Amino acid sequence: MNRCHFASFLSFALASPLSFAASKKITPKANSALVVVDVQNCFVEGGTLPVQNGKDVVPVINRLATQFDNVVITQDWHTPAHISFASSHQGRKAFEAVQLSYGQQVLWPDHCIQGTPDADLVSSLHIPNAELIIRKGYHQSIDSYSAFREADHKTGTGLTGYLRERQIQQVFISGLATDFCVAWTTKKCPLKGHLYN
């Protein structure tokens, strides 16, 4: 793979996400891919772990996705009693940190449990050209923020191979939440390249 360029698309964090998107000239090529991270009911208003104004990112991503031939969606997909849930650690509360075999882990409220409406993609997310959904965080004893690799830094999700097989050289990353899953996806991508904010 040659150079890869990463764009962390932080639209929901801004006061006016649509004007931000309009101000950025994103010109994908045939060897570009858009990775849409965790735009799920659990991470928007009314969900179990909501990102403030999370739904504001959806129309921006819908519009952006129409420009790409290659689109991948990720989905947080936890088992009940997942190791990252505070409820799985007696006497612990959500947002406390604990040390686990793979490193420090923030404990979360139960969220994005497999097969529940909370784990579903937001219904207004409309990306019919998406070719792949990567489910992450489904190993009960390992959390996963990155779309590429679980938090143990060993277990891959399959996304790297998918992008290499398609000879993708430019990756744009969008979604929820920029402080965790979007950030980790951007930082942990195993492909060489540059980060553009």
What are these regions (language model features)?
Residues 34-35, 73:
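Residue-level marker for buried hydrophobic side chains located in beta-strands
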Residues 168-184, 197:
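Glycine-rich anion-binding loop/nest that anchors nucleotide
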Residues 4-22:
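N-terminal export signals
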Residues 39, 76-77, 176-178:
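Active-site metal-binding loops of divalent metal-dependent hydrolases
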Residues 44-53, 146:
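Acidic/histidine-rich helix-loop elements
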Residues 190:
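Gly/Ala-rich phosphate-binding loop of Rossmann-like dinucleotide-binding domains
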Residues 59-170:
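Active-site alpha/beta core segments
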Residues 1, 18-33, 41:
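C-terminal segment of N-terminal export signals and the immediately downstream linker at the start
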